[in-house]
C-alpha cells in the first residue's frame, strides 16, 4: 500500500514537518511517497534519503540564511541560492533522485513559461534549491535552459503528484493565517508575507479534502517566515498536533 505525504511550504515553519514525521513514525505510519514544495521539499528530500527527524532538525539549525558570503552579485535576488549547493551536497552526495529510499516529487515554478514543474528524476539538488528560492529574496535557479523558483508560488500544497498513485494521503500544512491587528502590518515585509499567506491558503484549502489525514498546526501563525530563533518550539508544535490528529482520526493506516 502506498501512503503519500504532502509537505507544504512555509519557511522555517517547515520545521513543524519534522515534528510531524517524528509523530507519524512513533505511530508506525511510514509514508512511501512524498510531495513537497519549498521548505516541505527540503524536509521531504531529507526524509526520502532516510535521515532521521533529529538529523533533519540539526540541518535546519545549522544552515546559514542571511550570511554576507551568500549575498548575490549580478543575480535577481539578495541571496545567491546556488551558494547553498555545497551544503546540500554533503547530505546528498549522489545528487540524484534514484539514490533516495522513498519516491519524492519536488514542486517548482518554471519562470520562463509561467507554469508548475514537478521534478522526480535526474539531478536532485538544483530542483531542491529552486523549490526553496523565495522570489525577490533568493535568486532563481538555472536548470538546463530554464529559470526555476519557489514551488509555493503556484502550488504550496502539491497533492496532484500523489493522487493517482497513493492509497492514502496525509497532508501537513504549516502556513496558517489568523486575524491580525493593523499595527502589525506597518512594514513592507509584513504586508508582503501576509498577502502571500492569504493567497497560498486560498488555493491550498481547496485541496485539503483530498487528504485522509490533514495536519494543520494553527499555532504556527505567530511565527515568521524566517523565524530561526524558535525552531525547537516549531518542531514541538508539529509533533504535538500530529499526535493529536492521529488519535482523533479513525482511519486505519497501513503500518509496518
What spans do the regions from the language model cover?
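Patatin-like phospholipase
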Residues: 1-37, 45-256
Amino acid at each position: 500500500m502506498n501512503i503519500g505525504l504532502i509537505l507544504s511550504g512555509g519557511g522555517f515553519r517547515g520545521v513543524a514537518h519534522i515534528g510531524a514525521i517524528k509523530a507519524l513514525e512513533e505511530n508506525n505510519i511510514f509514508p512511501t511517497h512524498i510531495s513537497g514544495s519549498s521548505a516541505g521539499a527540503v524536509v521531504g528530500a531529507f526524509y526520502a534519503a532516510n535521515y532521521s527527524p533529529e538529523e533533519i532538525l540539526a540541518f535546519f539549525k545549522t544552515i546559514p540564511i542571511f550570511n554576507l558570503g551568500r549575498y548575490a552579485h549580478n543575480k535577481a535576488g539578495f541571496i545567491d541560492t546556488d551558494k547553498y549547493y555545497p551544503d546540500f551536497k554533503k547530505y546528498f552526495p549522489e545528487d540524484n533522485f534514484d539514490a533516495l529510499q522513498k519516491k519524492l516529487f519536488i514542486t517548482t515554478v518554471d519562470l520562463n513559461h509561467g507554469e508548475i514543474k514537478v521534478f522526480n528524476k535526474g539531478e536532485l539538488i538544483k530542483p531542491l534549491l529552486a523549490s526553496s528560492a523565495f522570489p525577490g529574496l533568493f535568486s532563481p535557479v538555472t536548470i538546463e535552459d530554464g529559470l526555476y523558483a519557489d514551488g509555493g508560488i503556484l502550488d504550496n500544497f502539491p497533492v496532484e503528484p500523489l493522487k493517482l498513485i497513493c492509497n492514502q494521503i496525509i497532508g501537513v500544512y504549516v502556513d496558517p493565517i489568523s486575524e491580525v491587528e493593523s499595527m502589525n502590518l506597518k512594514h513592507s515585509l509584513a504586508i508582503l508575507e501576509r498577502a502571500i499567506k492569504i493567497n497560498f491558503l486560498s488555493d491550498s484549502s481547496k485541496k485539503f479534502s483530498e487528504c485522509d489525514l490533514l495536519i494543520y498546526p494553527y499555532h504556527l501563525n505567530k511565527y515568521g517566515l524566517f523565524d530561526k530563533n524558535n525552531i525547537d518550539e516549531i518542531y514541538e508544535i508539529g509533533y504535538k498536533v500530529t499526535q493529536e490528529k492521529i488519535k482523533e482520526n479513525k482511519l486505519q493506516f497501513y503500518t509496518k
